[in-house]
Swiss-Prot record:
Name of this chain's protein: Methionine aminopeptidase
Gene this chain is encoded by: map
Enzyme class (EC, first level): hydrolase
Taxonomic classification: Bacteria, Pseudomonadati, Pseudomonadota, Gammaproteobacteria, Enterobacterales
Sequence positions that bind a divalent metal cation 1: D96, D107, E233
Protein species of origin: Buchnera aphidicola subsp. Schizaphis graminum (strain Sg)
EC assignment: 3.4.11.18
Keywords: Aminopeptidase, Hydrolase, Metal-binding, Protease
Length: 261
């Protein structure tokens, strides 16, 4: 596997891209309420990205028709914003943003709870986010890549949820998708983490079975059993002693139990 080690100049540019991607999610939070359409959310994000003098990486990517992915309830990933899809109280929503600034990509996503949600929805989103945080906690040079999937799967299954296996994290830089490919379940990858690697970790967690199906539009992926699904994603840089989260949000805080002392 040919993993690209980023130069200091490239890392500097990707930090700028990561900051913008994070700002999109920070900005859109106040708009996630009942009675807004997913297309309106898309348009608000698109305009914000343009104001930042960046470009949506999703728009036109292999024919994808919108600027961001919005996945609601049993949609696992790649949901297409639609003027007829109106959010309602009780929905859980993933917004996935990938931007390009000065030729360098950054990719991030998070869950939003709409109005009054039930305990299952809240717990699913919590465990999905915590599984990402647990994986971030182990990152440093010399760690085998497969450890990421091992940590995520163990945590998720110990909490009685399942990990989607068809989609994975990925290297990122000048290209949207680069090596290495980051599996979120137990695997036998021989890749060893090195300083200067940049990739995404983006576990997709289902309340029921891990099985998924792709819809006729060729993009939208749903759980086969119609159970809820949740995902969180960050773009991370491997540093000399750990990692730097390039898409960190200002209001984000990792619980102390997930931080090495």
């Amino acid at each position: 596997m040919n993993c690209i080690i980023k130069t200091e100049s490239e890392i500097k540019k990707m930090k700028v891209s990561g900051k913008i991607a994070a700002e999109v999610l920070e900005m859109i939070e106040n708009y996630i309420k009942p009675n807004i359409s997913t297309e309106e959310i898309n348009n608000i994000c698109h305009n914000f990205i343009i104001k930042k003098k960046a470009v949506s990486a999703c728009l036109g990517y292999h024919g994808f028709p919108k600027s961001i992915c919005i996945s609601v309830n049993d949609v696992v990933c790649h949901g297409i914003p639609n003027k007829n899809q109106i959010l309602k109280s009780g929905d859980i929503v993933n917004i996935d943003v990938t931007i390009i600034k000065k030729n360098y990509h950054a990719d991030t996503s998070k869950m939003f709870l709409v109005g009054q949600t039930n305990i299952l929805s809240q717990r699913l989103c919590k465990i999905a986010q915590e599984s990402l945080y647990k994986s971030l906690n182990i990152l440093k040079p010399g760690i085998p890549l497969y450890k990421i999937g091992e940590v995520i799967q163990n945590y998720v299954e110990n909490n009685n949820f399942s990990v989607v296996k068809e989609y994975c994290g990925h290297g990122i830089g000048r290209a949207f998708h680069e090596e290495p490919y980051v599996l979120h379940y137990k695997n036998k990858s021989h890749v060893i983490l090195e300083k200067g690697m940049i990739f995404t970790i983006e576990p997709m967690i289902n309340a029921g079975s891990h099985e998924v199906k792709c819809m006729k539009d060729g993009w939208t992926v749903k759980t086969k059993d119609h159970s809820l699904s949740a995902q969180y994603e960050h773009t991370v840089l491997i540093t000399e002693n750990g990692c730097d989260i390039l898409t960190w949000q200002k209001n984000e805080k990792i619980p102390s139990k997930f931080i090495n002392k």
